[in-house]
Amino acid sequence: VSPPLQTLLRRTTKTLGRVAKVAGERLAKAADADVMLQRSMAALIETAARRYPLDPGAQWRPGEPLKLLFAGYSGTRNTGADVRVEEMIRQFRHLFGDDHLDLSILTIDPALTRGYFKTVKQLELPEIFPRFMFDAVHQQHGVIACEGSMFKSKFANALSTLMVGGLGLAAAEHKLAVGYGGEAGKMDRSLEGLVRKYCADAYIIARNDASVAQLNALGVAAEAGTDTAWTFSPAPDAVGRRLLMEAGWDGAQPVLALCPINPFWWPVKPDLRMGVERAVLGMHKDAHYKSVYFHKAGAAVEARQDAYLSAIAEGTRRFLRDRSAFVVLVGMEMLDRRACEALNAKLGGGRPLFVSDEHDMFALVSVIRQASALVSSRYHAIVTTMPGLVPSAGITMDERIRNLMADRDQPELALEVDDPLLAEHLEATLARLFDDPGGVSAGIQASVVRNLGVMGRMGQLLVEYVRARHPAFPIRAGLGLAGSPWDHLPQLPPHVARLVHGPEGQL
């Protein structure tokens, strides 16, 4: 390239950069994309309420199957989100029967949920979803909001706006509107207002008491429940063992599974300036999430992430000085691959990676069920290994893992992502998991059985809600609050049934 042309290209690039920056700043000042989305959703809920007297949409009649739409975070290969919904669907099918249900579920990418959610129609969710939800809910008899982080600004306001939108639209058309097993936490003021206004007529069975209190403070009635992943049945152990052996495991050495994340790049927020700069100049690729949404980024985020991964690597190295273990790195969501690769490098490389972009939820959970110990920053990696009594600890960014360890009476097994002594504490924690697996597993078993009972009670509450709204709906005798919570669970995998019937069980 000739020097004059090089000069022209440099000037053109600078000009484009200035144009992109100015355009982005003007767009950002003109509108907050999160608030715009919330206002759009609110307007359509109000429109649905006005439309209802003239056009109520689908309304259940005796003899028809009950049409329910599950609204969540499926289609991103987030293993936890998919597992909890898989079990939710199994519970609904158990309670109401396939002959009486017509189920649909939202998915961000149908290719990533292919083979999941048997008997359920998958509906692709567009990036700009308010009008889609307005039309889709109109054709249903009810909405089941099923995202775990149901009412939170911690990860993305857009996701909670989707949850509120589904519930609000269903309530506006006098349909079933249920939030099932989700959490409420700290919310931006605009999202809090949306929840307060449009979830007041929904029925929320939250994941814990803290969420109930949070919702009650907003004037939203809620019952306490639990997560719904406890009954999940992964692929057979032989699948997990085969995958591990293909990765170099000898079949005998203890397996240590580490599940890192990037806890510092949340929340995902819209940034129109960055969106313009990415489109025009290809900038911000590492921070880009989707559309005009970007992860929190910058030198401070990178430094905190590096410190977190370095501490995990150092604590693991110290532990392995006198121990032998086959270390594997597990990404429970596709987004975790970068963290797994970075941790692998800090451990010297050569550690096998098992990430959800390559392994479905059945295979991935089968892999981690083979571990002798698990340390995870992913809540559902811990939950899905607990029925297998895998000794586990967490390195947590929020209250979910803290609450889980407290429920096990093992709060000391919840480490913190920003602990300046994380390496030291991790070394000691790994020693405990390997030296006292029976003691750790005893707390795990009691917690699993307790949470299964709570999940059964959630089924009882759900039955009573449907019965009150649709007295003519054919519900089996013995179901509801007059029955046993254990009859309201889907079929338990054999090893889980043994936990329930064993010395620590309830039956």
What does each model-found stretch correspond to?
Residues 2-507:
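Active-site anion-handling motifs in enzyme catalytic cores
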